[in-house]
Amino acid sequence: MLSDQAYDPPPEAGERRVHSALVRPRPLTPNRRLSPFHMTPFALPIDYPRIRRVDSFSALVSTPLTDGVNALCWERALAGDYAEVVAALGAGDGEPLMALDAARLRSLSVSAAGRVAIEQMLADWQLLRDHSLDPVLNCIYGYPRDEEAGPVVTDVFSFHADSAPFEASTYLCTYHGPSSEGLRNEEARRRVDLPATRAELLRHYGGADDADFAVYLNEHCYDLHYAPAPGAKPFSFGLGNFWRIATDYPDSPVPPCVHRAPDTQPGDPPRLLLIS
């Protein structure tokens, strides 16, 4: 898990993560002015039953992930100028990620619209904290890529599922910059199940395709990463939308939600991301 003190691969990297209890609703900041990034219309995938819309934070945290539903989306058009917040944060001193807290954000010299954006992000962060979750709010300038991936790339740009040892969900919201992307389970193939990839993994492992090999795949998180099927159409999580997605945990009633960090390019704006 990321902390304010050190940079590790973000939770979107598919690491085995532990989450705590649920969260309760809190009023949002009144609507004022939209950031330019929030002017782009957002549409959930049509006729995809695994995603369910909710209309409040209380519904986001209390609606069960069952009957095939593995993602909840609270669509929101947020007020505030998030681009101004990113500009005020600066270039990040060459680091790929800047951890944000109330003191740092409230010390920024921004307009009233920038202040609205700051208070919105902190309000969302507090919603999660109020329910004993461990959210992190970051300005992300770039993700490190897996330069020595071997047969399976395990960086944040690979489609993957989050994992936990017990029932848990991942909560996330992108406020600025490219947003997270999802992949329909029906269009996802576990990379370890692709014959050529599995054969190469077995060569790296140097043993038989048995229970010990399954442990090897699990320990390296290879079993959490997915390849899009031919013709797959990933979908955007959009900006300002608050998501709750299913993780891979023992006896889960639904498959995990497959997702990834956006494949950012040079010149793309930094991301403001809340995740728990």
Name every feature range the model reports, one short phrase each:
Residues 139-141, 173-176, 184, 247, ...:
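Short, structured patches in soluble enzyme cores that scaffold and shape functional sites
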Residues 1-38:
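N-terminal amphipathic/basic-hydrophobic helices that include classical n-h-c signal peptides
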Residues 68-71, 168-171, 240, 270-271:
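Short, surface-exposed beta-edge/turn micro-motifs
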Residues 219-276:
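Catalytic core of Fe(II)/2-oxoglutarate
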Residues 109-164:
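Extracellular-facing segments of soluble proteins and assemblies that are Gly/Ser/Thr-biased and enriched
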Residues 16, 30-132:
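N-terminal auxiliary "cap/dimerization" subdomain that precedes the catalytic jelly-roll/cupin core
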Residues 153-232, 238:
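Catalytic core of non-heme Fe(II) oxygenases with the double-stranded beta-helix
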Residues 83, 182-184, 253-254:
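Short helix/loop capping segments that flank catalytic or ligand/cofactor-binding pockets
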